[in-house]
C-alpha cells in the first residue's frame, strides 16, 4: 500500500524540497507499508526547535512540523531526522528518546540525498 504525503505551509520551493526529501527518505529508510499510511508535513514557524514528529490521532498516520527558518541543508536534514522518528514509531524500536539514532544518521543521509542531485 502506498504512503501518502500531504504538505502544507511554507513557500512553494520549500514544499517541493520537502516532497522530494519525503519521497527519497521513506524509500531509503525502508519505510514501507502493508496498510495505507498518511504523513502530513506542515512547514511553519516553531517556537524553539527545528522540527517534530508525532503520531496522528488516526492510527498509522503521522504529523511532522518543520521550521522554515533554517538553511536548505538543515531543512532537508530536519525532514530526514523526523522521518527517522516515523520509522522508529512504526517499528516500535528506539533507545531513550530516539535522538541518538537520528543524530547519527540525519546529516549522513542528507549528504547522500544532496549528492544524488535530486535537490
Residue positions per predicted region:
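Auxiliary, metal-adjacent structural segments of Zn-dependent hydrolase domains
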Residues: 2-58, 62, 111-114, 118-119
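Short strand-loop junctions, especially beta-strand C-caps/beta-turns
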Residues: 8-10, 67-69, 89-91
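Hydrophobic (often cysteine-bearing) scaffold residues that line and stabilize catalytic clefts
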Residues: 14, 18, 76, 80, ...
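Short pre-active-site segment immediately N-terminal to the catalytic Zn-binding motif
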Residues: 62-79, 93-94
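Catalytic glutamate of the conserved HExxH
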Residues: 78, 82-86, 90
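Post-HExxH zinc-binding segment in Zn-dependent metallohydrolases
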Residues: 93-119
